Amino acid sequence: MREVRLSVKAIIIREGRVLVLRCRDQGGVWYALPGGGQVAGETLDQCLRRECLEELGCRVRMGPLRFVRDYISWHHEFAAHDPNSHQVELMFEAYLEPEPSFPSQPDSMQEGFAWLDIASLPGCRIYPRVLERALSSAESNGVTYFGDVN
């Protein structure tokens, strides 16, 4: 079994829409928050800024921590893809410096990015799925731990 991986994600919201990565797999289009794994010697803020520059082509400013989740792959439907993965994700509010442009190092399944209406998230294939409910909630104080969810 591998070690636990720490990942940061950016929650960028503007005018009722959230900025997400647009990805594609055999099941079709799906969405995820921009972000990725922290490397040794890198602060969480540095990691978030690097990942957004790579995946969105823009700089961001880190805001407060909003959500934490565990993802233990063998507990979920994608276990066959990566059966030994355990990741802890820290999801921070983030604010765009310039507008997103073209990603310099998109993820392998990433097609680009999209602004999704938060109200329409229940009809989208977004991961983790709990974001459908969490982002539309009026409650924005404190940090919410989602647990081991997909």
Predicted regions span which residues?
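Charged phosphate-binding loop/patch that engages nucleotide di/tri-phosphates or the phosphate backbone
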Residues: R129-N150
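NUDIX/MutT-family hydrolases
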Residues: P103-L135
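Short loop segments at secondary-structure junctions
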Residues: E15-R17, R24, Y95-P100, I118-S120
